[in-house]
Design a protein with these regions (language model features):
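Well-ordered beta-strand positions
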Residues: 59-61, 107, 136
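A generic structural signal for alpha->beta connector loops
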Residues: 38-40, 64-66, 111, 142-144
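Helix-adjacent hinge/juxtasegments
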Residues: 40-83, 91
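Active-site neighborhood of phospho(di)ester-bond hydrolases with catalytic His/Asp-centered motifs
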Residues: 19-25, 42-47, 68-71, 95-100, ...
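Binuclear metal-dependent phosphoesterase catalytic core
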Residues: 5-8, 63, 86-93, 115-150
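Active-site environment of divalent metal-dependent phosphoester hydrolases
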Residues: 2-6, 27-31, 48-53, 75-79, ...
């Protein structure tokens, strides 16, 4: 949601990064994010990206990990993750990432890592702290994911 100042703070703190993944609601800021990141960027459209030509979802592989990203609203994530998990399993994803709820979550279910980094703009979890996640993949291909605060 156009949280450019928070994004700038996060990128300055975490740089250099190898990839940035944005899970939707850029509200026209995709070009700015891509220019600011200085690395490959994956962005999907959120429910507030009305006239965007961004993809609804993407799949890609990082160090042997099949990653599926979506904003999540088409999978009704506000009511639970079961539809999203079913889709991720159908796509043989190792990791599924979604946004929409603005609440951070990280867990594994049926062999799929499910994560929501929360929000650096409008957090909705208890305490309403702005959050994001950093994923590092070790030499064996195992991802380590950490929740961080702006």
């Amino acid at each position: 949601h156009k949280a450019h100042v928070s994004l700038e703070q996060v990128l300055e703190r975490e740089k250099p990064i190898d990839m940035l993944i944005h899970l939707g609601d850029v509200e026209g800021g995709a070009d700015y994010i891509e220019a600011l990141a200085g690395c490959p960027v994956h962005i999907v459209a959120g429910n507030n990206d009305y006239f965007s030509d961004l993809p609804q979802e993407e799949e890609f592989v990082v160090e042997g990990n099949h990653i599926f990203i979506t904003h999540g609203h088409y999978y009704y994530v506000s009511m639970g993750e079961s539809d999203l998990l079913k889709e991720a399993k159908g796509r043989d994803a190792d990791i599924v990432m979604y946004g929409h709820t603005h609440k951070p979550s990280l867990h594994e279910e049926d062999g799929v890592t499910i994560l929501n980094p929360g929000s650096i703009s409008y957090p909705r979890q208890s305490g309403r702290q702005k959050t994001y996640m950093i994923m590092e993949i070790d030499a064996s291909g195992m991802p380590e994911i950490e929740l961080k605060y702006v």
